[in-house]
């Protein structure tokens, strides 16, 4: 395009026989152009109202050119908003940009009834000043182009329009807004514009301080939207839908385990207590999700545009964050305790005291919750679907390191249990199939508990390792927005599939424990022996039997109940092996 313009100017000069004086450029005449007043800035965006010479009177205007110019000015202002740490005198640059796109206009009278409008092009000296103060502007401004940036002025050939003075040429001096800038700059301010979906906030205003949940993109006052656009809206919807469905199911099944092993169970053993507390912990984690989607994910996590929820400003975020931390920490500690219970049972050790672990687990968990709450560390953060501890060192100190140690202990205990099961079975049972059947359940527990938490650990520390790269990649996101391409722009973050799996793992524990424990033989026996269940069975049984007297009916029910109890006892006697080791193995398998 630039070569084409130079070629046209050369042809015009050659045909007219006019020699261009030094310091001047040759301009093209647009017959339909007019000198009009500035239409004014858009209602919702300040641009050039206070930055135009002569208050914006007589602006060179072609068809829709002022609207198009405003679009270009807005894009230029967006770009230099992010150059504040690389450039100086950017306020002057904005005056220059307004003068370039909304050029002053001179009207030349050709005849009493006819005139033509010509633009005053931007002076090269002013262009050089802008580029020297901000070298990045050189990418968009070629100050050596005399057509756009003449040193003195621009010659226009008006002979085709009937102008005869000076061989039909008319000289228009270049525009220099320096004097005007010096007069009004003290009353003018630099205009920051953030490309959508970034939002403009005043970081110096305490109401919009960074510690209130705003994520500023230095050196500007632009903040990232909430939630952060790491993924498309479709992927966010998939993640939130998964969370709603799994959390609800997991919550119900966890309560079932608590009811079965902790409330209606007549003989609550130590393994049953561990199962009960573990399931209760998972229910607490899922309750946070239920509260969150009950209120609304964006309403709770992003209470204001561009602001993520913080404990000190958003009490519900602090409450759900405390519940989540209490639940997930308790969950890890009780998984460790379950491993110790199984190990002591197989080794026939007497040192395990359940109440000690109950006090220890509860004390540690509550202490970490109190520390996090007292220091206001519960917040939504960037790109998350629940409130929790987002401060890096607090999260590592209060959860990942201590709970990682607990998981390691629990995993070693469960591995030791499997080893003891193998040794005992080898001595007393020769059938390999029976050996595999006995080891299958604890082996699956190891895979699902330890493996799941191991994935959470790896994912978290992998994000921490790459966090610096994610932050530096924000520049690419901003460039994508500034380029105005048709493609959707995203910030750089964790890959979607591992991120989705991270939240999936946290929410499947209730379902997994129901499959392990809620469907076990001992769970069914607990319900069969429950008084309420018996009364329901008794009320249903007569309806399916022939008519008889009440006494006979009661006698049959009692007889059936007695027979059922005898059958259960006989089944239990059949299942108990003569050797004590085999009995212990059966107990481990059930629990």
UniProtKB/Swiss-Prot annotation:
Transmembrane recorded as keyword: yes
Signal peptide region: 1-17
Topological region Cytoplasmic: 266-275, 343-353, 419-442, 517-591
GO cellular component, one term: membrane
UniProt biased composition (Low complexity): 538-571
Localization, UniProt: Membrane
Domain FZ: 30-177
Membrane-related topology note: Multi-pass membrane protein
Subcellular location, principal: membrane
Residues listed as glycosylation sites in the UniProt record: 167, 187, 202, 230, 483
Region spans: Disordered: 538-573
Disulfides per UniProt: 35-105, 48-98, 123-174
Record's keyword terms, sorted: Disulfide bond, Glycoprotein, Membrane, Receptor, Signal, Transmembrane, Transmembrane helix
Membrane-spanning parts: 245-265, 276-296, 322-342, 354-374, 398-418, 443-463, 496-516
GO molecular function per UniProt: G protein-coupled receptor activity
Topology feature Extracellular, residues: 18-244, 297-321, 375-397, 464-495
Family per similarity comment: Belongs to the G-protein coupled receptor Fz/Smo family.
Protein name: Frizzled and smoothened-like protein F
The organism of origin for this protein: Dictyostelium discoideum
């Amino acid at each position: 395009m630039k070569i084409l313009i130079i070629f046209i100017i050369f042809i015009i000069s050659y045909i007219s026989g006019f020699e261009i004086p030094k310091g001047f450029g040759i301009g093209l005449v647009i017959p339909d152009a007019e000198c009009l007043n500035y239409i004014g800035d858009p209602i919702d965006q300040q641009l050039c109202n206070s930055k135009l010479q002569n208050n914006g009177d007589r602006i060179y205007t072609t068809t829709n050119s002022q609207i198009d110019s405003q679009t270009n000015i807005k894009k230029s202002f967006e770009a230099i908003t992010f150059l504040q740490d690389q450039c100086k005198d950017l306020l002057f640059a904005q005056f220059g940009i307004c003068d370039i796109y909304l050029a002053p206009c001179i009207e030349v009278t050709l005849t009493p009834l006819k005139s033509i409008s010509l633009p005053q092009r931007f002076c090269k000296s002013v262009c050089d000043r802008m580029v020297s103060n901000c070298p990045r502007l050189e990418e968009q401004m070629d100050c050596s182009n005399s057509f756009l940036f003449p040193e003195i002025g621009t010659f226009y050939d008006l002979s085709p329009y009937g102008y005869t003075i000076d061989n039909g040429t008319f000289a228009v001096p270049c525009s220099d807004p320096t004097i005007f800038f010096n007069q009004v700059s003290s009353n003018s301010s630099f205009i920051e514009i953030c490309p959508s979906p970034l939002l403009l906030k005043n970081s110096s205003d305490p109401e919009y301080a960074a510690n209130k949940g705003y994520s500023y993109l230095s050196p500007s006052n632009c903040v990232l939207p909430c939630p952060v656009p790491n993924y498309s809206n479709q992927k966010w919807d998939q993640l939130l839908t998964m969370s709603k469905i799994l959390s609800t199911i997991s919550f119900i099944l966890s309560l079932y385990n608590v009811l079965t092993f902790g409330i209606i169970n007549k003989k609550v053993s130590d393994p049953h207590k561990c199962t009960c507390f573990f399931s209760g912990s998972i229910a607490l984690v899922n309750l946070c999700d239920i509260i969150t989607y009950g209120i609304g994910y964006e309403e709770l996590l992003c209470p204001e545009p561009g602001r993520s929820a913080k404990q000190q400003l958003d009490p519900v975020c602090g409450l759900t964050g405390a519940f989540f931390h209490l639940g997930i920490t308790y969950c890890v500690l009780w998984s460790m305790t379950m491993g110790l219970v199984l190990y002591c049972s197989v080794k026939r050790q007497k040192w395990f005291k359940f109440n000690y672990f109950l006090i220890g687990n509860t004390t540690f968990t509550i202490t970490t919750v109190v520390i996090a709450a007292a220091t206001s560390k519960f917040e939504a953060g960037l790109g998350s679907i629940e409130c929790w501890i987002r401060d890096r060192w607090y999260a590592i100190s209060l959860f990942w390191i201590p709970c990682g140690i607990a998981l390691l202990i629990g995993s070693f205990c469960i591995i030791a249990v499997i080893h003891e099961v193998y040794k005992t079975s080898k001595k007393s049972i020769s059938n390999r199939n029976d050996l595999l059947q006995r080891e299958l359940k604890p082996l699956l527990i190891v895979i699902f508990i330890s493996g799941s938490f191991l994935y959470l650990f790896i994912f978290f520390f992998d994000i921490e390792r790459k966090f610096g790269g994610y932050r530096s990649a924000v520049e690419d996101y901003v460039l994508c927005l500034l380029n105005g391409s048709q493609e959707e722009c995203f910030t750089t973050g964790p890959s979607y599939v591992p991120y989705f799996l991270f939240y999936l793992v946290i929410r499947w524990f209730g379902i997994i424990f129901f499959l392990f424990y809620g469907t076990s033989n001992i769970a069914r026996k607990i319900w069969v022996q429950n008084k309420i269940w018996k009364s329901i069975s008794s009320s249903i049984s007569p309806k399916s039997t022939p008519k008889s007297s009440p006494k006979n009916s009661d006698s049959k029910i009692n007889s059936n109940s007695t027979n059922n109890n005898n059958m259960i006892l006989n089944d239990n006697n059949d299942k108990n092996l003569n050797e004590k080791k085999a009995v212990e193995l059966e107990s481990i398998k059930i629990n």
